[in-house]
Regions:
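Short helix-loop-beta junction
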Residues: 146-164
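Glycine/proline-rich, positively charged
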Residues: 168
Length: 168
């Protein structure tokens, strides 16, 4: 489908189920551009919730970001807020290579400013969420919330923390 001009989006109920098709993701989608000498592209997005969502069995609570991030040819996206989620998803859909788009189910109820208009956020670019001078916290996804809490506590003690969100 991707090699005929389509840009499919595969949605998993949970990324744990991606393991059923991991061979096709890692050995086909991720490698087709390199195996074809650049003749073929594979613009596909695999998206769904990752990691713990609370009150789910251990088989539905695993985080596979590092597995996919260590696969040449795949791009991995894990947004930390609604604004980034929209802009990064639009970029993922437009990308000519396969993108793993993982969302924290714990954040599905989060609210934030999201413009109705068109915008994208480039893949592969981290975001400095907070400037700081004493120490830097680098994280992604739902754990960014914990980084803010830690930074707020330290700021009360006069320690200014920089927060970097990897995003992709």
């Amino acid at each position: 489908s991707t090699m005929t001009g389509n840009r499919p989006i595969v949605e998993y109920m949970t990324f744990n189920f991606s393991l059923v098709g991991i061979d096709q993701i890692i050995n086909n989608a991720a490698k087709i551009r390199q195996m074809s000498g650049g003749q073929f592209k594979c613009p596909i997005v695999f998206r769904g919730p990752t990691a713990s969502a609370g009150q789910l069995a251990a088989t539905h609570s695993q985080a596979f970001e590092s597995w996919f991030a260590n696969t040449p040819g795949l791009k991995v996206v894990v947004p930390s807020n609604p604004y980034d989620a929209k802009g990064l998803l639009k970029s993922a859909i437009r990308d000519d290579d396969p993108v793993i788009f993982m969302e924290s189910e714990q954040m599905y109820g989060d609210k934030g400013e999201v413009p109705e208009g068109e915008y994208t956020i480039p893949l592969g670019v981290a975001d400095i969420k907070r400037e700081g001078t004493a120490v830097t916290i680098v994280s992604f996804g739902t754990i960014i919330k914990e980084a803010y809490k830690a930074a707020d506590e330290l700021e009360n003690e006069g320690i200014y923390v920089e927060i970097i969100d990897l995003r992709t």
